[in-house]
Curated annotation (Swiss-Prot):
Lineage: Bacteria, Pseudomonadati, Aquificota, Aquificia, Aquificales
Molecular function via GO: hydroxymethylbilane synthase activity
Note: The porphobilinogen subunits are added to the dipyrromethane group.
Name of the protein in its database record: Porphobilinogen deaminase
EC number: 2.5.1.61
Provenance organism: Aquifex aeolicus (strain VF5)
PROSITE patterns: PORPHOBILINOGEN_DEAM
Cofactor(s), names only, from the UniProt record: dipyrromethane
Family membership noted in the UniProt record: Belongs to the HMBS family.
Gene name tied to this protein: hemC
An example Gene Ontology CC term for this record: cytoplasm
Length: 304
């Protein structure tokens, strides 16, 4: 019996879906077909995601196909998956995380702190924008949408002096050698670097097939980060970030909430037992909300 994987049509999405397809074929000897689906986020390419609003812009149509039974599983970038999974579906596996950080690629080869004042930086994410402003208020941040190839082309055409992208996407699309700097002090997007495999609840057969793809450490980090973001009701339209990693048996997590201009930037840190990932994520969210995050979020949501 053929297994159908639902995926977006972009080059990066197909790389991700093929990664899962190759595994299933080699490991289990099953036949796998990719079903390419256009999502709302793919159709709207000229408007910042924060302006469109709404969650699940890159997954809704794929989830619908999964619920209807026209596909057997879906492969997403974990960072695109909304915090609340539709009834009847669940995350069956989260793959081993690629390098989770953001990277800077500049035309001049200069790092973030070396770029001349007034340099134009392209990024689509509010999370990245506020972290740039916090460090270099003298740089000009401009919205940049599109896939990795499109963003790299715009950089090379001179529309931007530098762009900030996720390391994972840059590597998967073959641009790793062009990285100027890995921004390890930037807090990445929730789930950045991992793939999420979404399945129907109760579909034991598919669940067994994808089980070996699940990475327990990445799964626990994802729970901590996603619990944090769910408490904040955050999506693409809010400047927040959370990052968890497990070192020597301890889950260490840092996160931030900021206003749009990075004038009020609230950070926090937690560490504890990885098995209490959900509790750690929730308590860090509560701490940041109490420290002024709640007020910031109210202002942002009311202005949208």
């Amino acid at each position: 019996m053929k297994i159908r994987i639902g995926t977006r049509k972009s080059k990066l999405a197909l790389w991700q879906a093929n990664y899962v397809k190759d595994f299933l074929e080699k490991h289990w000897g099953v036949e796998v077909e990719l079903v390419k689906i256009t999502t709302t986020g793919d159709k709207i390419t000229d408007v910042p995601l924060a302006k469109i609003g709404g969650k699940g812009l890159f997954v809704k149509e794929i989830e619908k196909a999964l619920l209807e039974g026209s596909i057997d599983l879906a492969v997403h970038s974990l960072k695109d998956v909304p915090m609340v999974i539709p009834k009847g579906l669940k995350l069956g596996a989260i793959t081993k995380r690629e390098n989770p950080y953001d990277v800077l690629i500049s035309r001049s080869g200069k790092k973030l702190y070396e770029l001349p004042s007034g340099s134009v930086i392209g990024t689509s994410s509010l999370r990245r924008q506020v972290q740039i402003k916090k460090r270099r208020r003298d740089l000009k941040v401009e919205v940049l949408r599109g896939n990795v190839d499109t963003r790299m082309r715009k950089l090379k055409e001179g529309l931007y002096d530098a762009v900030i992208l996720a390391y994972a996407g840059v590597k998967r699309m073959g641009y790793e050698s062009e990285i100027t700097e890995v921004l390890e002090d930037f807090i990445p997007a929730v789930g950045q670097g991992s793939l999420a495999i979404e399945i129907r609840e109760g579909d034991k057969r598919i669940e067994e097939l994808i089980k070996p793809l699940n990475n327990e450490e990445s799964f626990l980090c994802a729970i901590a980060e996603r619990t944090f973001l769910r408490r904040l009701e955050g999506g693409c339209q809010v400047p927040v970030g959370a990052f968890a990693k497990i070192e020597n048996g301890t889950l260490k997590m840092k996160a931030f909430i900021s206003d749009i201009e990075a004038e009020r930037y609230i950070e926090g840190y937690r560490e504890g037992n990885p098995e209490e990932a959900e509790k750690l994520g929730l308590s860090l969210a509560e701490e940041l909300l109490k420290k002024g995050g709640e007020e910031i979020l109210k202002e942002i949501y009311s202005s949208q």
